[in-house]
């Protein structure tokens, strides 16, 4: 008798993806973040669904409905903070996942990488429209500032902004449509995740050595199911510590003040996970230039496969590029710090230097390091 999981049309797909999947025997914990992202997405959709049951997307009642969720709904405070801090954990896992992809050369799996970039952009869009929903001061002014950036687009900019707003300012129509977007996008993300996995399983996973691992594969279950389970437990533990002890540490105090179009907050700063991009945006004095730099800060990821000239897969045996990579990570952390600082000296100057460094490292330094390493290899061949 044949095993049902190998013959049943539906279960067979799950079997080939999570049970009998041939996996490299040496993939490290850096490969855990894919499954952690899946868990984050499920947590966000579940908590989001329960929040949507009590939330009202009307400017008059949105802020009050969030207060009502926290005060009157059974465990509403828990659901709300799980959703808010779950988003932060989601982005931390996302950035580590992308960072691992850059370090180990996973961008050479072109289709998987490109779908991943689209996923990153879609997730950022989802988080942005979600941040507007509580209708606090930072929600309102964040929405105003970021949507206003589109007015920098020549010729159609102003019309486009008013079209997105559904009026001449961020108002009731904007909030309603942002709620609609925030509800539908996670399901689109889920569909794209399946495509992401489909392309990944076409080629198989990369591994830390960067060598072909066809001769040394092990089944995904039980080895990596349990390894993933450990990662999930650690993720949930960190998330629960965050939610139960420091629920507001990543939030903004201004968002506990209801939205007021007549009063601008002293410093408009986005959520913790967008600060690096916000710093790049602010570092360019020209509006259109800033918007283009903001877009390029993410889209430049698509250039990695094109800029790669190394004879080796990944940075495991490439010490020079490793040094540049870690300088790049440090630079990214500096940008994150600058994004949360006021627009004044010396922060503006540091931001400009860090922004130039961000693009210089990717476009110039990494390819040069690859060429040097290739020449060293030739000398010792």
From Swiss-Prot:
<keyword id="KW-0813">Transport</keyword>
<dbReference type="InterPro" id="IPR048259">
    <property type="entry name" value="Cytochrome_b_N_euk/bac"/>
</dbReference>
<keyword id="KW-0408">Iron</keyword>
<keyword id="KW-0679">Respiratory chain</keyword>
<feature type="transmembrane region" description="Helical">
    <location>
        <begin position="77"/>
        <end position="98"/>
    </location>
</feature>
<feature type="transmembrane region" description="Helical">
    <location>
        <begin position="347"/>
        <end position="367"/>
    </location>
</feature>
<dbReference type="InterPro" id="IPR016174">
    <property type="entry name" value="Di-haem_cyt_TM"/>
</dbReference>
<feature type="transmembrane region" description="Helical">
    <location>
        <begin position="178"/>
        <end position="198"/>
    </location>
</feature>
<keyword id="KW-0812">Transmembrane</keyword>
<feature type="binding site" description="axial binding residue">
    <location>
        <position position="182"/>
    </location>
    <ligand>
        <name>heme b b562</name>
    </ligand>
</feature>
<dbReference type="Pfam" id="PF00033">
    <property type="entry name" value="Cytochrome_B"/>
</dbReference>
<dbReference type="InterPro" id="IPR036150">
    <property type="entry name" value="Cyt_b/b6_C_sf"/>
</dbReference>
<feature type="transmembrane region" description="Helical">
    <location>
        <begin position="113"/>
        <end position="133"/>
    </location>
</feature>
<keyword id="KW-0472">Membrane</keyword>
<keyword id="KW-1133">Transmembrane helix</keyword>
<feature type="binding site" description="axial binding residue">
    <location>
        <position position="196"/>
    </location>
    <ligand>
        <name>heme b b566</name>
    </ligand>
</feature>
<dbReference type="GO" id="GO:0006122">
    <property type="term" value="P:mitochondrial electron transport, ubiquinol to cytochrome c"/>
</dbReference>
<keyword id="KW-0249">Electron transport</keyword>
<dbReference type="GO" id="GO:0045275">
    <property type="term" value="C:respiratory chain complex III"/>
</dbReference>
<dbReference type="GO" id="GO:0005743">
    <property type="term" value="C:mitochondrial inner membrane"/>
</dbReference>
<dbReference type="GO" id="GO:0008121">
    <property type="term" value="F:ubiquinol-cytochrome-c reductase activity"/>
</dbReference>
<dbReference type="Pfam" id="PF00032">
    <property type="entry name" value="Cytochrom_B_C"/>
</dbReference>
<comment type="function">
    <text>Component of the ubiquinol-cytochrome c reductase complex (complex III or cytochrome b-c1 complex) that is part of the mitochondrial respiratory chain. The b-c1 complex mediates electron transfer from ubiquinol to cytochrome c. Contributes to the generation of a proton gradient across the mitochondrial membrane that is then used for ATP synthesis.</text>
</comment>
<feature type="binding site" description="axial binding residue">
    <location>
        <position position="97"/>
    </location>
    <ligand>
        <name>heme b b566</name>
    </ligand>
</feature>
<dbReference type="InterPro" id="IPR030689">
    <property type="entry name" value="Cytochrome_b"/>
</dbReference>
<feature type="transmembrane region" description="Helical">
    <location>
        <begin position="226"/>
        <end position="246"/>
    </location>
</feature>
<keyword id="KW-0349">Heme</keyword>
<dbReference type="InterPro" id="IPR005798">
    <property type="entry name" value="Cyt_b/b6_C"/>
</dbReference>
<feature type="binding site" description="axial binding residue">
    <location>
        <position position="83"/>
    </location>
    <ligand>
        <name>heme b b562</name>
    </ligand>
</feature>
<dbReference type="GO" id="GO:0046872">
    <property type="term" value="F:metal ion binding"/>
</dbReference>
<keyword id="KW-0999">Mitochondrion inner membrane</keyword>
<feature type="transmembrane region" description="Helical">
    <location>
        <begin position="320"/>
        <end position="340"/>
    </location>
</feature>
<keyword id="KW-0830">Ubiquinone</keyword>
<comment type="subunit">
    <text>The cytochrome bc1 complex contains 11 subunits: 3 respiratory subunits (MT-CYB, CYC1 and UQCRFS1), 2 core proteins (UQCRC1 and UQCRC2) and 6 low-molecular weight proteins (UQCRH/QCR6, UQCRB/QCR7, UQCRQ/QCR8, UQCR10/QCR9, UQCR11/QCR10 and a cleavage product of UQCRFS1). This cytochrome bc1 complex then forms a dimer.</text>
</comment>
<feature type="transmembrane region" description="Helical">
    <location>
        <begin position="288"/>
        <end position="308"/>
    </location>
</feature>
<comment type="similarity">
    <text>Belongs to the cytochrome b family.</text>
</comment>
<keyword id="KW-0496">Mitochondrion</keyword>
<dbReference type="InterPro" id="IPR005797">
    <property type="entry name" value="Cyt_b/b6_N"/>
</dbReference>
<dbReference type="InterPro" id="IPR048260">
    <property type="entry name" value="Cytochrome_b_C_euk/bac"/>
</dbReference>
<dbReference type="InterPro" id="IPR027387">
    <property type="entry name" value="Cytb/b6-like_sf"/>
</dbReference>
<feature type="binding site">
    <location>
        <position position="201"/>
    </location>
    <ligand>
        <name>a ubiquinone</name>
    </ligand>
</feature>
<keyword id="KW-0479">Metal-binding</keyword>
